[in-house]
């Protein structure tokens, strides 16, 4: 099964080439890889041209959301997978995804990989902090032997949805550029389209070098919490807790249900309404 991978990148060539090497080495199927290159003056643009990679381009950094939407315009498969440029995909990652996709009779699902990182992943396991000191054998052995369960309530990259669903929600909301709050907003839009399967696939593991692009660059982040609250009436934490059940430890047990109001939820709702009023002032 062919998947269209969309990958925004901003002068991060060393990590990007490492990411691409993992796809070449560890994919069972041939996939469409689409970059969106922001700036590219570090050699990324020339690298893409010389290697005949498929890409869209902007002279400056247009933000995560706009980058993803630009790249997605070129997608020609039924499934779109968004990935970071500083990830390393495990062996047979696509086989695990395809096996999962084949379980569904409709397209109302959102599937994600399991982030492994030094100290900021769903699973914390040190295999290195850069491509140069990455212990690939250690990562492979960990992926082979780990018995973690699939989890409930995912809202993070890498994530896959059907192309029709992507179009239905209009991709990523560009008012969240440069990107803070964009993932929960995307999931909220899917929720409003009756998606109730938000599932993390344990076997589909990626090693993530901790959002290197955002950390290294002097990028002024937007206030995603404020924008999300003004848009939906509650903040991303409330959405993750009561809708997605996504605290990173809930084992997947089927499609989610609409949240039922209890005393704790009601108190949080009142607090969120006060925050909403504060943001509106």
Give the role of each language-model region.
Residues 21-30:
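Short, acidic, metal-binding catalytic loop of nucleotide-sugar glycosyltransferases
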Residues 91-129:
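Conserved donor NDP-sugar-binding/catalytic core segment of glycosyltransferases
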Residues 2-4, 32, 185:
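Cell-envelope/extracellular polymer assembly enzymes that use nucleotide-activated donors
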Residues 110-113, 125-151, 155-160, 197-198, ...:
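C-terminal, non-catalytic tails of nucleotide-sugar-dependent glycosyltransferases
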Residues 58-75:
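Glycine-rich, basic loop-to-helix element that forms the pyrophosphate-binding segment
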Residues 80:
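Short aromatic/hydrophobic "clamp" motif used to bind/position activated sugar donors
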Residues 96, 152-161, 165-170, 176-204:
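A short, conserved alpha-helix in the catalytic core of glycosyltransferases
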Residues 29, 37-46:
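A conserved acidic beta->alpha catalytic loop
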């Amino acid at each position: 099964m062919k998947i269209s991978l969309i990958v925004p990148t901003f002068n991060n060539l060393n990590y990007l080439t490492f990411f691409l090497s993992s796809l070449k080495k560890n994919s069972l199927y041939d996939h469409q890889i689409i970059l969106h290159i922001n700036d590219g003056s570090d050699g990324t643009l020339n690298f893409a041209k010389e290697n005949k990679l498929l890409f869209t381009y902007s002279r400056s950094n247009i933000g995560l959301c706009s980058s993803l939407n630009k790249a997605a315009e070129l997608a020609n498969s039924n499934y779109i997978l968004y990935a970071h440029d500083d990830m390393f995909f495990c062996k047979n990652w696509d086989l695990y995804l395809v096996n999962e996709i084949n379980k569904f009779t409709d397209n109302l699902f959102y599937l994600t990989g399991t982030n492994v990182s030094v100290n900021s992943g769903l699973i914390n396991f040190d295999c290195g902090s850069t491509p140069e000191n990455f212990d690939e054998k250690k990562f492979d052995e960990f992926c082979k032997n780990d018995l973690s369960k699939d989890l409930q309530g995912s809202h993070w990259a890498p994530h896959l949805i059907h192309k029709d669903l992507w179009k239905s929600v209009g991709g990523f909301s560009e008012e969240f550029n440069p990107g803070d709050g964009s993932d929960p907003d995307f999931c909220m839009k899917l929720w409003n389209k009756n998606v109730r399967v938000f599932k993390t696939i344990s076997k589909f593991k990626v090693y993530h070098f901790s959002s290197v692009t955002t950390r290294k660059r002097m990028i002024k982040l937007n206030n995603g919490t404020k924008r999300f609250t003004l848009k939906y009436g509650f903040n991303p934490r409330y959405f993750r807790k009561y809708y997605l059940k996504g605290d990173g430890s809930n084992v997947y047990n089927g499609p989610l249900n609409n949240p039922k109001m209890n005393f704790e939820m009601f108190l949080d709702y009142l607090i969120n309404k006060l925050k909403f009023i504060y943001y509106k002032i």
